[in-house]
């Protein structure tokens, strides 16, 4: 009897062992994944851009200098330009920046462009009369032509929006200064009997500037980005050119008196719309 019980216990133990082993075989171990190293999001970057500035209409005003003797000598009138525009052209820029996180970055940029500028104004009625023209007809006008070189130094901040695959849209804004330098201005009086041609020294000045940006960057690699964007740049107004040699003379064909000095014309500033493409390299 005891021998039979022992055999029964051994059989039960064997069955239990086999059942436990089979159950263990059915348990699937979940794989353990090691977290991938994340690229460093903070760090410095360099950028370079080229762009195209579209034609920009603006405004301006100029003083008419009376060359006759005292008490008539001096500024008779101030006239607004009927048309005053900055032509389109290429722009170039470089910059250095710093990324704080995956949303916020800032940079300092230096940009340059050069463009022709043209102004047109109808002659005053008394000038038309002096040429024997009908003073109320559109038969006489002035044309002013020059070129402007514009440098901008800007401090910018950007917000990178959520990524869509390799694309990262962004919005930005900047403030800074613009250095505007005009070449010599050439003025022509246009009418059937007009002969006036004069050169006027262009002025240069520092001005306040602000910008708004929007665009998208494309990941060429994890460090190199292709940047496509739009920028609106506002440059405040300033002096454009001085008086010609005849106006500056103390003695002329009409008599003697103080010569003209200082700026004769001022522009109202520029609203410049630019499309740009560039590369941005981020150090990691």
UniProtKB/Swiss-Prot annotation:
Key words of the record: Signal
Signal peptide: 1-23
Pfam families, per the entry: OMP_b-brl (PF13505)
Protein family membership: Belongs to the surface antigen msp4 family.
The protein's name: Uncharacterized protein BRA0921/BS1330_II0913
């Amino acid at each position: 009897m005891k021998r039979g019980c022992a055999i029964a216990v051994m059989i039960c133990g064997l069955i239990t062992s086999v059942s436990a082993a089979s159950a263990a075989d059915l348990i699937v171990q979940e794989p353990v994944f090691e977290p991938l190293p994340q690229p460093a999001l903070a760090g410095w970057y360099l950028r370079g851009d080229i762009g195209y500035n579209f034609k920009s209409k603006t405004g301006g005003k100029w003083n008419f200098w009376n060359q006759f003797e005292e008490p008539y000598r001096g500024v008779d009138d101030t006239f607004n330009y009927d048309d005053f525009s900055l032509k389109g052209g290429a722009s170039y820029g470089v910059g250095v920046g710093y990324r704080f996180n995956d949303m916020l970055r800032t940079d300092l940029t230096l940009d340059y462009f050069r463009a022709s500028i043209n102004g047109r104004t109808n002659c005053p009625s008394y000038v038309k009369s002096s040429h024997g023209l009908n003073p109320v007809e559109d038969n006489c006008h002035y044309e002013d032509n020059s070129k402007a070189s514009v440098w901008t130094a800007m401090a910018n901040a950007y917000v990178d929006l959520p990524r869509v695959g390799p694309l990262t849209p962004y919005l930005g804004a900047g403030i800074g200064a613009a250095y505007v330098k005009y070449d010599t201005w050439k003025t022509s009086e246009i009418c059937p009997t007009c002969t006036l041609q004069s050169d006027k020294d262009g002025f240069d000045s520092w001005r306040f500037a602000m910008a708004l940006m929007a665009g998208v960057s494309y990941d060429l690699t994890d460090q190199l980005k292709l940047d496509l964007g739009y920028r609106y740049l506002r440059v405040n107004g300033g002096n454009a050119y001085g008086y010609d040699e005849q106006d500056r003379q103390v003695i002329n064909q009409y008599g003697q008196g103080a010569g003209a000095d200082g700026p004769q014309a001022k522009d109202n500033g520029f609203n410049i719309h630019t499309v740009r493409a560039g590369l941005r390299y981020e150090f990691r």
